[in-house]
């Protein structure tokens, strides 16, 4: 199992910068840029000499499931996949949001689950968990750090992409001036189907102890 750290170096009014680290060595960098009057952003990054981008898609969305805030995955100027938010609706009274990704003809899902003062994200490929994202709910000066635990090397890149999409749709606020601050997030999910996506023993069973 691999442990990857996404460490935010800076946050300006319309931009943010991250480093991707493994064993304290920088293996990639990411620059996120927003603009006035828009909640969307462009993500440009490098990972092991691979250049990639996430860009908001303006295409008309079709299909049986609703798609929100769709982004294209771009590598070497070619679109290789898409990431978007959608809703799972079990019945009239039971639903939850999650993130879906189609990449290189494979399907991935990210479930973000809140347990009060703890938020955990479980990433699945074909209904099998492949990685888990953990991070602090206490944020200083709007700088966010993420730790990704990844079972197999083949899923490192897609897990990183999903993490940056998560940051854009949840935490990135273009146009907001950065000040010295401490923010504590608190939220509690009650949907049993969503909560069931989290396995508290997954990291230890995969062979990596925190």
Describe the role of every protein-language-model region:
Residues 1-210:
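Intrinsically disordered, low-complexity proline/glycine-rich segments
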